[in-house]
Amino acid sequence: MNNLNSVFDYEDIQLIPNKCVINSRLEADTSVKLGNFTFKLPVVPANMQTIIDDKIAEMLAKEGYFYIMHRFEAENRAAFIKKMHQQGLIASISVGVKADEHAFIREISADALIPEFITIDIAHGHADSVIKTIQLIKRLMPQTFVIAGNVGTPEAVRELENAGADATKVGIGPGKVCITKVKTGFGTGGWQLAAVKWCAKAASKPVIADGGIRTHGDIAKSIRMGATMVMVGSLFAAHEESPGQTVERDGQLFKEYFGSASEYQKGEHKNVEGKKILLPHKGSLKDTLKEMEEDLQSSISYAGGRDLSALTKVDYVVVKNSIWNGDAI
């Protein structure tokens, strides 16, 4: 493991500006390549039931954004792949690691329903079960880009890459509705950005930073530390289009947002590592995506470059928990 004293998180880091070389931030290119595809932003909405559904997946794919469909309506996944392909769109799904999921992988392979992306999505991804699932997918569908996670250590990244994963997802419980750290004592909460840095250093393939993103500036910080893509939950929750239920409180509209390991998700109170919260209604998802793009373009201009690669080279300072100076976000 790296020097455990050098841990930091998003609010502890400030990036240092370089001389600007573009006339307008609109010249900055925020696109990113993942596998054989190029996407508009290095951002993917979390594959959670209160964040993404079929409609949002279609909208994102049509507009040139990356998406990962959640795995919580397992029986609809084959039809989802078919529907996306019929429209000439990429299919990007999630799977678990149990026997029924292996049967599903064999089934879509036999039916030639080959998704472009499969994300193996479990809470503790440094596991033999994940390695076996990677190997199964790669044996049956070698052309499919496999994302595996979630992990929090360089050792885990190396092992999953060696098993055949094309990218790893880094983050154990730093998310807003994840309580893994409280329930188990384990996780990357409080040092998620350092975990991204260490894991990216060990990686030879893309790393997706997953969890703990509270502001658009955190996306730039993730890229600085080596992430290719950033998975975002709470910032994408509670939009007009979001699947979460709308609730009215004191004349204000809110939407539900819950974790993938919450009892609301599982439908039972067993091994619960997530909770449910209400977030203020945020308007249109397209507006948020546009604002994210503009903020990232500004980040690139501050980095002194023309595209995302500029962010990987900037200097930064560690300002222990003080960038807010007591202000709320």
Curated annotation (Swiss-Prot):
The UniProt keyword set, sorted, is: NADP, Oxidoreductase
UniProt keyword Cell division present:
no
Positions annotated as active site in the UniProt record: 178 (thioimidate intermediate)
Recall the GO molecular function terms of this protein's record.
GMP reductase activity
Q: For binding NADP(+), which residues are annotated in this chain's numbering?
A: 207-230
Q: Name one Pfam family in it.
A: IMPDH
InterPro entries noted in UniProt: Aldolase_TIM, GMP_reductase, GuaC_type_2, IMP_DH/GMP_Rdtase_CS, IMP_DH_GMPRt
Does the keyword NADP belong to this entry?
yes
Which PROSITE patterns does this entry report, sorted A to Z?
A: IMP_DH_GMP_RED (PS00487)
Determine the domain of life of the protein's source. Bacteria
- E.C. designation(s): 1.7.1.7
UniProt record, GO biological process: purine nucleotide metabolic process
Q: Which reaction does it catalyse?
A: IMP + NH4(+) + NADP(+) = GMP + NADPH + 2 H(+)
Question: Which residues constitute the signal peptide according to the record?
Answer: none
Give me the Gene Ontology terms describing cellular component: cytosol; GMP reductase complex
Described by its record, this protein's role is as follows: Catalyzes the irreversible NADPH-dependent deamination of GMP to IMP. It functions in the conversion of nucleobase, nucleoside and nucleotide derivatives of G to A nucleotides, and in maintaining the intracellular balance of A and G nucleotides.
Family membership noted in the UniProt record: Belongs to the IMPDH/GMPR family. GuaC type 2 subfamily.
Q: What is the name of this protein?
A: GMP reductase
Gene name for this UniProt entry: guaC
